[in-house]
Amino acid sequence: MKIGLALAGGGIKGAGHIGAIKALKENGIEIDCVGGTSIGSIVSALYAMDYSTDEMLRLFKYFAKDIMKIDPKYYWSNVKSKRNFMGYGLLSGERIEQAIAECAELKGLKNIKDIKMPICMPTTEITESKKYVFTNQETQDETKQIEYINDIPLGKAVRASASYPGVFAPTVFKGHKFVDGGIFDNLPTHEVRKLGADKVLSIRFSSEKFYDPKNLFEVALKSVDLLFDQRTASEVASSDYAITLDLPEANVFNIKKIDYCYNQGYITTLEHMAEIKEIFKEK
């Protein structure tokens, strides 16, 4: 039996995915294929490249601190061209691409098709209003409602899946403009099944239902999160088992809560371990 792991988007909360993976590995639950959206694509890529959970956590912390820095060149290019920041994003997203590319290079990898473990990461083509999926498998959609790309630098693919609207600029690749995959598919359960998984374990985050936005930017982020949460619900229902990580002390961009999210991901997954072993016991 092949086990697939689907990881939802959720910003800094994605550290919880790493804690969950640690708990799974410690209990002998071996994953055969993986898929993730937005921050889930970052964790999926690191996992598929065979980084340990300790290495993943260290890299995650490094990414979080570096990625959220304003790039002066990008900032002033927007100012000089009078470009609308909310239309393009406060950050370029180049640091995400560079960081993943460096991690891939250390493993002798470059392109998504270089990864041995089956992997997928959804994104959104903003001009076409269409779902795209980056994968190292030969996948097609006969309905043409979804497009698949299996030849793209890994860093570029992750950046495209994680280009959170209004925060990161769209990722441009071969004439396409890609933004966060959560708009169409924030928890890629169905896509992980297409990788060959017999059963899929999904990990998502509870929504901040009572969070009170304090400014226009927070209102925009909350609105996007509500959209993503709605997209996640149907995918949870199609999972063989789903873990919901409740992280009330964290929000999407609070980098001070990385360890908290990681620890809660680990603890929560251990609490579900008896059920997980029962469902995924045949390997």
Language-model region placement:
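Patatin-like phospholipase
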Residues: 1-37, 45-283
